[in-house]
Amino acid sequence: EFDNIVGSGSVTISAGQSVKTIEVAAKSDTANDPIDAITYTITGVTGDSTGAQLGEGLVKTVQINDNDAPDISWAVSAVTLEEDSGTVSVTATIDGSITKLSSSTININVNPSSDDTAVYGVDYEILELNQVSTFAGSGQTGSNDGIGSEAKFRRPDGSVLDASGNLYVADSDNNLIRKIDSSGNVTTWAGNGDWAHDRMEGPKLEVGFARPSFMAFDSAGNMYVAENGRQRISKIDTSGNVTHVSGNGDHGDAIGDKNSTQFRDIGGIVFDSNGNLFVVERNNHKIKKLVFDPSSGAATSSEFAGSGSYEYANGNGSDASFRHPWGIAIDSNDNLYVSDHNNHRIRKITPSADVSDFAGNGNWGQKDGSLLNARFRNPGPLTFDSNGDLWVADQGANTIIKIDISEGYVSKFAGKVGNNAHKDGSLDEAKFSRSMGLSINDSSIFIVDNESHRVRKIDLSPSITIPATQTSASITLKGIDDY
């Protein structure tokens, strides 16, 4: 078992030798672990050697796969639940307590009986799904790694999910990128935490980021990071190396190559299907587009939408105007959706840069309704789910909003309208605190609360999570009358 081990040592290559082998032996344990990894680097080479490296590269990683998945048993093999008639508890038990500080999550399926020929709508609800919980963070500022509430953040901003379901959070005031796996284990994934550090390129844990704020993955799995402390975009490639992509570090408004481009207060960033990166500029009130050279990979920026004036107008490209645009998301047809923060609207931008109103009537407030009759209160981050529906963190109201695209309807999904606060509980009673990050997959919504220094979670699919040191857990199904 190898868990969070950091160490160093020396290797001596004697005269006449050119290779020294380090052996790693995996030790068996009884815990159900995630995949462990040990990464080796070489530093401080001395003597007559002209250079030393690990194999063919400068970094090598050893992966240890776990073989201790627990056996799961159920209290009963099947249960029957009548519509609109009481509740039933489903309990899962594993064959031994989880000794490692992690949890096990078991996804379950709930189906109508085989002889049910008249199924309409949904005949049950999972009571535990209608809850907002704290996924990670103690609420106190700090940079501690750990499980759930053991971890600490300092004014975290944006978030993004990778293809494996890991959540990445821009821990802005810690100048770090944090990774949270499905069990809530928080680790420092990139950054040395030192804004003043003069190394802005290199291995990801040696680079000093400056207020990382928002992130996006390209189709190859490389992460792009908006650094608002330096007004630039950096890239973390799949080998863990950080390079400068765009932005010369000055607050301004200029386009061109990476050393000519200037940004002013970067908001959300997103890739289209052609590999172009769109960058929201909150205080330039516009969206820039980065196009990458297919040979060199160098990025060139251009104006895409927005006049730069703090106004409201629809139109094409620079004929349109925004007031402090904030978040950005993209649909399957490469249409962009931008939260126009101080116009209290969601704007739609086609691939040809035609800007129009998509949702919100422009009046400040929180009101459900059809797309252009609904009201927002300073909308912030937004993201699409796999069904093509758009979700919005309405920052001024401290609520999470769902926009049903097919129905053309806007409705509050979670959060009690009010000032910044922290409260877990039912969807209607939960409270949020300036949500800066919003990410969603098929099973969960993740909300990054900037002022409470926490990551919140809403479960969307039936699952049972057995906490560390426990052997069982339950969920409750309630029958409902759907017609």
Predicted regions and their residues:
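Conserved beta-propeller blade signature
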Residues: N166-Y168, N222-Y224, N276-F278, N335-Y337, ...
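A short loop-to-beta-strand structural motif that recurs across blades of beta-propeller domains
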Residues: N175-K179, N185, Q231-K235, N241, ...
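Gly/Pro-rich loop segments of beta-rich domains
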Residues: L129-R155, N185-S213, N241-D265, G297-W326, ...
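Short boundary segments that mark the start of a structured unit
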Residues: E1-E128, S461-Y483
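Short loop/turn segments immediately following the C-termini of beta-strands
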Residues: S172, N228, R282, H341, ...
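Blade-level signature of beta-propeller repeat domains, shared across WD40, Kelch, NHL, RCC1
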Residues: R434-S461
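Short loop/turn segments immediately following beta-strands, especially the blade-tip
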Residues: L290-S296, S406-E407, L460
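Residue-level detector of Asp-centered blade-edge/turn motifs that repeat once per structural unit
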Residues: L161-S164, F217-A220, F271-N274, I330-N333, ...
